[in-house]
Amino acid sequence: ALGFIPHVENDGYICYTEDNIVLNPKLPKEILEDTMLQVLETLKKGQNKINDKDFVEEFEDYWFRNQVKHDTNIISSFKPTDEVQLIRKAKIGGKIIIDFDDNSIIESAIRFNISRRPKPLFRNCIYIPLEKPLLPPKYSEFWGSSEFKSKIYDNISKGNKEKLNEILEKYHNIKKEELIIISQPKSSGISLYGVI
């Protein structure tokens, strides 16, 4: 077994090319040959850890596949910052919407046709920007609570640690299923994902 490598999904499916390709049905032999070469190249790069950076670039996909059992849709219109902060969330029409304030959440619910007249229950959630990207957890070995906390806490600036500690001290009785939104850098911007 090759272990957990980029582009190999938990069901064994191998993604070796972009989604937007056009195949010439008049060349089936060439398509199969090229497919096999690309699959072997993908596996070789993964085994030799040459394409581990792809875990970071496609972090959200691996995160989603690993946590599909929770099936929570999160919609966000807020622009992530470099500071730990409390933001707002509400569950509307089976989706969780996050933003900086309640009015922005209502606007998002209307704009995305989730609800015309939402009357949600608003709650705080914590936004945490990481300094360096994490690699996703293996499909069969999702992080436990203490491991996840350690990965986050060890990967934020000193100022953000202080801010996070202030928030946690103030809200020390946060319920079990509170939402934490994490951002982490990648070459084309950031990845944004949530943890309940």
Segments from the language model and where they lie:
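N-terminal ligand-binding/catalytic initiation module
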Residues: 1-196
